[in-house]
Amino acid sequence: MNKLLELAAAVAMVNDGDTVAFGGNVLYRSPIAAVKELIRQDKKDLHLVKTAIAYEVDLLCAAGAASRVTAGFVGYEGEFGLCRWYRKGVESATVRADENACYSVITALRGAAYGVPFLPIRGMLGSDLLDAVGFRKVTCPYTGEELVAIRAIAPDVAFLHVQKADEMGNGCIIGPTYEDTVIARAAKKLVLTAEEIVPSSYFSEDPNRASIPAVLTTAVVKAPGGAKPCAVSGCYDMDREELRAFLAEKDPDAALRAAGIERRKDA
C-alpha cells in the first residue's frame, strides 16, 4: 500500500484539540517541517508530548497553537538557553505545563503502546511532581509495595523524522532512536517525514533497517531538510544562525517570520 502524501495532506490529519507527539530529542532529528505546517494550517489547542523538547514547542507557542505541554525537559541546551515563547505561554496561563521526568513521559507512551490505562513506576516517590502533576499512588497486589501510577498517553497523531523511508511506511533511523519506536506504537496515527524515499527493496534486503515498521505508519512524506534547523545524523548539523535569528525576535509574528513561516490565508 502506497502511503506517500504531500506534507499539507499529512498534517491535515491533525484536528484542533489533538494530542500530538514528536520524535527526536531537543535539537536532533525533530520533525520541524511538520511543525511549521501545523502553524501554516492554523492548528489550535494542541497538547504537545515529547520527553525533551525545544524548537517545536517554542514555534507552536509563539503561534498560539499549543495549550498544553507534557515533557520532562523544555529548553535548547547549551548556547541557546530557555524556550522563550513556551515560558511566556506558561507565565500568561495560556499554556498548561505538565512537568514530568523524561522517563515518566516514556512510561505514559509505553502504557498506550501496551494498551493499558497506566503503568507503575518506582522512581517518583518523594518527588514534588506527584502533587504538582497529580500522579496517583497505587499498592502492588503482589508485594504491597507503594508505587506511582503513570496514566497512559496515546497521541492522536505523532510525527517522526527519519533519514530513509519507503512508500509503504517503513522508516530507517540512523543514529540514536531516542523514544521514537515507543511513540510509533503509542500513537493512533503516525506520520513519517523522511530525508529520502527509497525503494522497498532497501528494507526487504535487510529487515533490521526498519526502525519503524510499515504496519505502524499512516502516512509518509518526502521532506529533505525536514528537521532543519535541527540536526540529523549523517545529513546535516544544526543551523545555529536560524536558531539565533528566531530567538532574537521579541515579537511572536516576527519570530515566526524569522523561522520562515507565513500563515496560510485560507487556514
Segment roles from a protein language model:
Residues 1-267:
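Conserved alpha/beta enzyme-core scaffold
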